[in-house]
Amino acid sequence: MANHPEPENAISSFPMLSASECFAWLTVFGMEAVAIVTLNALTIIVYLKERSLHRRSMYLVIHLAIVDMFVGASVIIESWKLGNICDFWMIHRNPFSLLIFALYRAFPTASAINLGAISLERTHATFRPFQHCLIKKKIFGATIAIVWITTGLISTSFFLVNVLHSQALHIFDISWFSFFLFCNLIIVISYSSIAVKLVSGTQPHHHGATNRERVLTKTLFFVTVVSLLLVLPYIISKTLENMSLPTYKMISRGTYFRLNNFLLFLCYANSLVNPVLYAFRIPEFKKALFSVFHRRSQPAQVFPLN
């Protein structure tokens, strides 16, 4: 294990960190959690209200908004861990805390798997647009089920390893972060092939539904690129750390703490990307979003009594 273990692996502290700095990081993560939950909840409301968004190609996107909203819970748990590191409170090692940490890993895992599933779905929609239109709803339901089954297996494995053989947890961590890299590899390959297809211009342009799918594909491409830029630094950093490279042993604990929290903040910001880019890139989403705010800001009409 690297010389900076995660708090769920071993309860540790950073005595050289000031209380004010710890409080500042707690505030940052707290605000990020609120923003993640609020924006993704708003995204879900917009999807539910706008009928034009109730098409099959949007099912995985809607599911991603739901998963990203739950990522806000992971940020809250991150703040709980941070308070333990800063000696604001104590986290005791027991089955309940281990279950909480399993959930802490579950939601980002589900988000990564869902992004991979979206990239494969967009690849199929780009290369086989007419066959894609014939896909039944139950296929998307099965895909969502696979996302959560895989997430459940990974989270259960983490819980069992932590309970039965906590010393081997760093091996699980390497496998976990490697799984994230594998999901990102699928995403990169999928969207690279899509980009080549779109640039070559061999896709038909005359069908309205096909053009709409192209817009959605480009939007999800931008979302994924930004997501990778936000997530990969943290994933690569933790993978290298768990490999116990000498470079990490040379970093002071205070420097590690700040670097780790900064990369974590960027990683969680990935769950803020989707609602923002949807608002700028998907016309139906933008229209529905303005409609929601317009209804809330519109004063109630008062009819005079005769």
Set out the residue ranges of the language-model regions.
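Intracellular effector-coupling site of seven-transmembrane GPCRs
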Residues: 193-237
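Helix-to-loop junction signature of class
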Residues: 29-33, 70-89, 104, 108-112, ...
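Extracellular TM2-ECL1-early TM3 structural module of rhodopsin-like
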Residues: 18-33, 56-118, 170-173
